[in-house]
Amino acid sequence: MTSTHIYYAERTDVESIYEMAIEYKNVDLADANYPDIDRGKLIHFINTMMKKGKIILMRDLDKDKLIGCCMFNKSEYFFSKSEIMQIQIVYIKKDYRNFKLVKTLIDSVKRQADGLPIVLSITSGLGIDPVFEKLGFKNMGSNWRFV
């Protein structure tokens, strides 16, 4: 079993997070017909998430390798001033994926949410709805894209 370490991202982690996002796009989103990654925009997004939200990283201690991340921030419903916690990205590298590691990341978000509703939009097409249902999320609809 892999020994993992969960921690908050720091400025020194930006390049590693960027590389993980590239892998996510190239491996899991390869068939999704998404546009190419713009390095400047993605780096800006990562920095913005570190300023206005949180980035939780997961590292394989045995291999000293970044294996997962979750980016999230407080937001509001578009129709209300009531706050929500919005998960922007939750990702674990393919070889490491299991329910326990996903639960660990989501539990970290729950602790930060302090009772706020947590909203997660899935746009990968990976068919992992049952995992999030098992974690207590309720399916409130679907993401649709016209290409």
Segments from the language model and where they lie:
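A conserved beta-turn-beta hairpin within the catalytic core of GNAT-like acetyltransferases
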Residues: 76-87
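Conserved beta-strand-loop-alpha-helix junction that forms the acyl-donor binding cleft
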Residues: 109, 119-130, 147
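A short, internal acetyl-CoA/4′-phosphopantetheine-binding micro-motif in the GNAT/acyltransferase core
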Residues: 87-98
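A short helix-loop-beta-strand connector motif used in the catalytic cores of GNAT acetyltransferases and
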Residues: 44-57
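Conserved beta-strand in the GNAT
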Residues: 57, 64-74
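A short beta-loop-alpha structural element at the N-terminal edge
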Residues: 3-19
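Conserved GNAT-fold acetyl-CoA-binding loop/helix
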Residues: 25-44
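Conserved acyl-CoA
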Residues: 104-117
